Design a protein with these regions (language model features):
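Short Pro-Cys-Gly-centered "Cys-loop" motif that presents a nucleophilic cysteine in a tight turn
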Residues: 1-57, 66-230
Length: 230
């Protein structure tokens, strides 16, 4: 079955994946990373997209963000891609595409599923062995350090699920640290990544049904083969 067209709905958090062309590195050093977060902040601010979490890996970027109006996420990602590609190509004397086609994304159900997606992003560049040391240097170029109470590279808009972890910043950071230390079950991780790659919403059957009614689009795979004769 062909991949469903990418869906974006204002007001819902989206898990976004940007990958380097042919698996190539999109960051050679921290100068590149700083240039990227600068371009990211500019693009999201211009198009009014709230950023909840981010992780810069060697060949890809994970973002968790919420567009406030329809079409804003797509515009922000296009602007980000063009802006950073120009800087990267100029700095490294290269030409051609930096990214592997269009960005991939999934709409994430609010609640525990959304909090789990945020943990997934923060774990992407976190060394689990160092999380308990409270050393922010062990979590470079991700929002993990901010969710643990340290300064970060990009301003964040915390989701309600993070605020619900405790009454004080210390309580929230402590509760989040526990989650960051826990490994995501392989099946849950696979479901989340598959949802991103196939552009399908990630959540319960009730959530998907609600989105289908809201968007008037089929969001679940149909049965294979021809329809049964009646």
């Amino acid at each position: 079955m062909a991949r469903l067209p990418r869906l974006s709905v204002a007001g819902y958090a989206h898990l976004v994946l940007l990958r380097g062309h042919n698996g190539e590195s999109v960051f050679h050093d921290d100068v590149d990373r700083q240039a990227f977060v600068g371009a990211l902040e500019t693009a999201l601010k211009r198009d009014q997209v709230a950023l909840h979490a981010y992780a810069l890996q060697q060949d890809r970027v994970w973002l968790l963000c919420t567009p406030h109006q329809q079409g804003q996420l797509s515009r922000a990602m296009q602007s980000l891609g063009r802006r950073f590609s120009a800087v990267f190509n100029r700095r490294h004397d290269r030409s051609g595409s930096l990214w592997d086609g269009r960005y991939r994304s999934t709409i994430v159900e609010p609640g525990a599923t959304l909090l789990g997606a945020m943990v997934f992003v923060d774990q992407a560049v976190t060394d689990p062995a160092l999380v308990d040391s409270a050393d922010p240097a062990s979590m470079p170029w991700s929002s993990a350090r901010q969710h643990l109470g340290f300064d970060g590279a990009v301003p964040l808009s915390d989701i309600a699920e993070y605020w619900a972890l405790g009454n004080t910043p210390f309580d929230r950071a402590s509760a989040y640290r526990v989650r960051l230390n826990e490994s995501m079950p392989p099946d849950a991780r696979e479901l989340l990544v598959t949802a991103v790659l196939k552009a399908r919403p990630h959540g319960s059957a009730q959530f998907l049904d609600s989105l289908q009614r809201q968007t008037a689009r089929r969001l679940t795979p149909g049965r294979r083969g021809r329809p049964r004769k009646v």
